[in-house]
């Protein structure tokens, strides 16, 4: 009886040992790419986001206070594909500063309707995920004075060479674009988009300059403005919106980000965005 008990106990111990050894030799998942392993060890994807509010791209929900938006969800989805959560840094001083900090490695990626310029590409590496037409919202009287009898199909070139007063957000891509495309204009940078719009409505500038989604949003939400102001879209001048990475991140996860964009996001135009987020562009009632 004792021998049987001993044999039974030995069998249990043997099975237990085999069970333990089975799990002990199971490989622990580790990424071969060091940068991805660093993200996994940290448990989060660090994401830089502009210090502004720009629905439907990034904003705090009025009811919950939670950070929401198209760009926010892209960042969260990318983080989820890597097996971590996204954490957001909104402490940059401006759009340009955000890109600079991305290049310096303050976060893994920077997103937030960030335009692509040569200056920014000297700071960080861009990955295009949207492309929007350039646009201006201008006072009708100012435009009429510049156009005169010039046919509409010839007016764009004349407008770009004009001496109009044009407003934009300082230290943004449109600060750079204004210098390039409006060399003769009086260019005035403002702290934010609200101040830009106020300057236009107060008559301090003849037009304000940004991408089509922001210009068309103004007249879509308040149709009565079209009596005095006219949106002008430049069909052949495109603002390529990019997600930015540092050189270190680019070398190790740039291809992963491109794969994610091509499969899960796909490059969106301003028309596609406005159709997808109709609620943000419909008239205020």
Region spans (language model):
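Alpha-to-beta junction loops
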Residues: 45-46, 83-85, 103-112, 164-165, ...
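A ligand-binding cleft/hinge motif common to bilobed small-molecule-binding domains
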Residues: 96-97, 113-122, 177-180, 194, ...
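Periplasmic-binding protein-like
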Residues: 51, 130-138, 143, 212-261, ...
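A conserved helix-loop-strand patch within extracytoplasmic ligand-binding domains
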Residues: 33, 84, 92-94, 114-119, ...
């Amino acid at each position: 009886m004792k021998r049987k008990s001993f044999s039974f106990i030995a069998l249990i111990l043997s099975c237990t040992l085999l069970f333990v050894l089975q799990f002990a030799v199971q490989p622990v998942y580790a990424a071969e790419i060091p940068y991805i392993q660093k993200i996994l060890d940290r448990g989060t994807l660090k994401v830089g986001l502009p210090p502004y509010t720009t629905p439907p791209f990034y904003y705090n929900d009025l009811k919950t206070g939670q950070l929401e938006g198209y760009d926010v969800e892209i960042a969260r989805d990318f983080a989820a594909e890597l097996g971590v959560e996204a954490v957001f840094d909104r402490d940059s001083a401006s759009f340009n500063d955000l890109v600079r900090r991305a290049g310096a490695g303050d976060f893994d990626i920077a997103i937030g309707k960030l335009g692509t310029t040569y200056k920014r590409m000297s700071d960080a590496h861009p990955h295009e995920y949207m492309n929007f037409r350039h646009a201006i919202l201008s006072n009708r009287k100012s435009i009429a004075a510049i156009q005169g009898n010039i046919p509409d199909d010839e007016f764009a070139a004349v407008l770009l060479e004009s001496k109009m007063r044009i407003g934009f957000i300082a230290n943004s891509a449109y600060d750079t674009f204004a210098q390039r495309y409006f060399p003769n204009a009086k260019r005035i940078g403002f702290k934010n988009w609200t101040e830009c719009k106020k300057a236009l409505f107060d008559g301090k500038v003849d037009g304000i300059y940004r991408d089509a989604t922001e210009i068309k949003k103004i007249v879509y939400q308040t149709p009565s403005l079209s009596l005095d102001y006219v949106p002008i879209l430049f069909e052949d001048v495109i603002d390529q919106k990019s997600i930015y990475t540092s050189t270190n991140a680019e070398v190790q996860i740039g291809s992963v980000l491109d794969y994610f964009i091509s499969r899960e996001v796909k490059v969106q135009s301003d028309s596609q965005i406005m159709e997808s987020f109709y609620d943000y562009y419909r008239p205020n009632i």
